């Protein structure tokens, strides 16, 4: 408590009941930005697990590149959650642009994807930074595991863009995108080397 009070620049003896509106706003902002709170207990959650997600994506997509990540437990409004995500490129994936598969507590979300927080994070990503252009053969699988998924509607088909969820989704996608970028760079180098070799094979007999 003392450490947080120092971070928020409040005196430890300052009571919440005596705070004015401006101080309450300042306290709320500090609570949202403070990173040293204890992580929530994830024992009540049932994530897929990185290994199971990787095996499932490998079997279904047979990609040239595959990476998965499971983020540590976080919380929004006191409800714990875990973000799991996988990204796959090439192989049997068709070249029709980025395809996103969304799951929440192991249940696929099939409708109303346009206003979903996962789609928002994917669409806000500058894919050209990761050497992805045009309509790539790229698949993203996202799983939100929580004691209370913040659905936008009673139909439970899209997830609200809570800041805590959005932050964890962005960090998961950033981690995977960097790995994909490394793969694409190596792929480009290999293709360039192959072109050079073909040129040498073509013109060396003429020298």
Residue ranges, per PLM feature:
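GHKL/Bergerat-fold ATPase module in large chromosome/replication-associated machines
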Residues: 12-14, 20-134
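Helix-hairpin-helix
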Residues: 1-8
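Charged regulatory segments coupled to nucleotide-binding catalytic modules in large multidomain enzymes
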Residues: 20, 24, 88-207
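Short helix/strand-bridging catalytic loops that position acidic/His residues to coordinate divalent metals
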Residues: 9-14, 156-160
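Extended hydrophobic-aromatic, low-complexity segments
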Residues: 2, 13-14, 150-154
């Amino acid at each position: 408590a003392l450490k947080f009070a120092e971070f928020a620049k409040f005196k430890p003896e300052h009571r919440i009941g005596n705070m004015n509106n401006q101080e309450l706003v300042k306290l709320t902002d500090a609570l949202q930005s403070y990173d040293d709170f204890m992580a929530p207990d994830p024992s009540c959650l049932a994530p897929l697990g990185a290994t199971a997600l990787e095996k499932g994506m490998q079997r279904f997509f047979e990609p040239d590149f595959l990476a998965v990540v499971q983020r540590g437990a976080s919380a929004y409004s006191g409800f714990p959650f875990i973000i799991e995500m996988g990204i796959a490129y090439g192989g049997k994936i068709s070249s029709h642009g980025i395809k996103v598969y969304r799951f929440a507590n192991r249940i696929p979300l099939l409708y109303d994807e346009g206003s979903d927080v996962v789609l928002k994070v994917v669409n806000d990503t500058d894919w050209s930074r990761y050497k992805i252009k045009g309509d790539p053969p790229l698949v993203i699988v996202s799983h939100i595991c929580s004691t209370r998924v913040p659905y936008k509607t009673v139909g439970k088909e899209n997830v609200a863009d809570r800041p805590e969820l959005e932050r964890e989704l962005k960090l998961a996608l950033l981690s995977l995108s960097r790995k994909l970028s490394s793969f694409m760079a190596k792929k480009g180098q290999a293709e360039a080397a192959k072109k050079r070799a073909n040129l040498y094979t073509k013109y060396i007999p003429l020298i």
